[in-house]
Regions:
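Single conserved hydrophobic/aromatic residue that forms the stacking wall/gate
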Residues: 219-232
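Non-catalytic RNA-recognition surface used by pseudouridine synthases
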Residues: 1-83, 89-218
């Protein structure tokens, strides 16, 4: 069952206008499609599939060391226990970090209910929590605990097994899924917590096009020219 308030940004059709008769003066630089791998890696974004365990900063550090880059950042923190899409911005691309972090996100999570709840009541709660919501960051967070406005574009009820509820959530950047599960539990008057979480999308980057650190290491060693093909 799907509860949708509005279409997520990445599903909105966008068109790019191209002047076919235009030419770029070679003195301004190289054709993007003909740039050497060294230049591409000086301003690229790598879509990394973060495993559970390491911090987001540790992933960024590993990528920086592997590529021999001067700096690397990430497009939105994932807690150590959370896996999934983590865009890593390299060198010049770090200037775009804020734009990537503000992009929409999509997660798949397991919410654990603390009591018995009917399907009807659960669906009522999920519908209520779509659209614009108010949210206070969790106690353990890196930002000040003041009320913020966030948008839940869509909540999809994928599966339910007793008190375990599998959800796919599309939301605006800065949404705390852990707090969302807790707030749903408060509304249901039984309590709930986020048991497991995976990020499946961050802006234009999805898990279908993500590479693990092992993938990146093997490509860097055996097929370095492919790095330009998997970067953005």
């Amino acid at each position: 069952m799907i509860f949708e308030a509005e279409t997520p940004p990445w599903e909105i059709e966008r068109r790019t206008l191209v002047r076919l008769d235009a030419e770029t003066d070679p003195s301004y630089g190289c054709d993007p499609y003909k740039r050497p791998i060294e230049k591409l890696l000086k301003a690229c974004v790598l879509n990394i599939d973060k495993p559970r365990g390491p911090t987001s900063h540790e992933i960024a550090f590993t990528v920086r060391e592997l590529l021999g880059a001067e700096q690397a950042g990430h497009g939105g923190t994932l807690d150590p226990a959370v896996s999934g899409v983590l865009p890593i911005l390299v060198d010049e691309a770090t200037k775009c970090a804020e734009a990537v972090m503000k992009g929409g996100k999509e997660y798949v999570c397991v919410m654990r209910l603390h009591g018995e709840v009917s399907n009807e009541k659960l669906e009522e709660a999920l519908k209520l929590f779509t659209g614009e919501i108010y949210q206070v960051p969790p106690v353990r967070s890196s930002v000040s605990r003041r009320i913020r406005t966030r948008t839940i574009y869509r909540i999809e009820l994928l599966e339910r097994d007793g008190r375990n509820v599998l959800l796919r959530i599309a939301c605006s950047g800065g949404t705390y899924i852990r707090k969302l599960c807790s707030d749903i539990g408060l509304y249901l008057k039984c309590g709930a917590h986020m048991q497991e979480l995976r990020r499946t999308r961050a802006g234009p980057f999805s898990e279908e096009t993500a590479y693990t650190l092992l993938d990146l290491s093997l490509i860097h060693i055996s097929e370095p020219t492919r790095l330009g093909m998997i970067s953005y």
